[in-house]
Amino acid sequence: MFFEEAVSSGPQFFNLVPWIVFFPVLGLLFNIFLGGRILERGEAGEKIVGGVASLAAGLSFVVAVLQAVSLIGHPEGEVVVLAEWIRIGELNLQWAFQVDTLSVTMMLVVSGVGTLIHIYAIGYMHEDVRHNGDPGRFRRFFVFMNLFIAAMMILVSGDNYMMLFVGWEGVGLCSYLLIGFWYEKGKDGIGNALAAKKAMVTNRIGDFGFLLAAFTIFWTFGTFEFHAIFEKAPEVAVANPGALDGAGG
């Protein structure tokens, strides 16, 4: 009994969840504005640039762990509202994060694996630092990686379909940038560039299906927010049995 009460009254860190996005964004901003000068220090500069990017991803993982700890005592989770985002007529969208078992699981996977990739890339990208006399490539790679982590975090934690779409677009952009990163390396570079373009076109096809489904759901439920849709789903199913089939495709 004492253990159950202790768990149920455990610490809550839900209010920290926006930092899963803020930390990677801070990391990429640091390297955008300061990374060029830091790389002038040579190999030591590489370690700083890569280390800052890795630290940003690692701190995002720490926040994800804290969300998992919070769920132990509060399994119902929470929706954390950061700010009002879009208000058009009856449409009122907030920039909010959904903290539940599924989203936290994905946060842990994305930030955990992403941090390991960042650390590995510090050494892996060493030979690419001075490629074609462009030392900025090393910095750009880690900027793209931090941006990818931030976009993925929005994708897996957003509380509405429009935030999900923003994350989806960000991940698509980063995929294009990273797949085609070595676009100038001879025949291999041509293959990289073509693969990047193919990924971009494929994602744009996905955009059409995504938006079609999202606006069909909005037409059916009158909202883009996940928790509101889940609450209304049983009522809509009873009132119009065919509505959910149409909304779900």
Region roles according to the model:
Residues M1-G249:
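...captures the hydrophobic TM-helix bundle architecture rather than a specific catalytic motif
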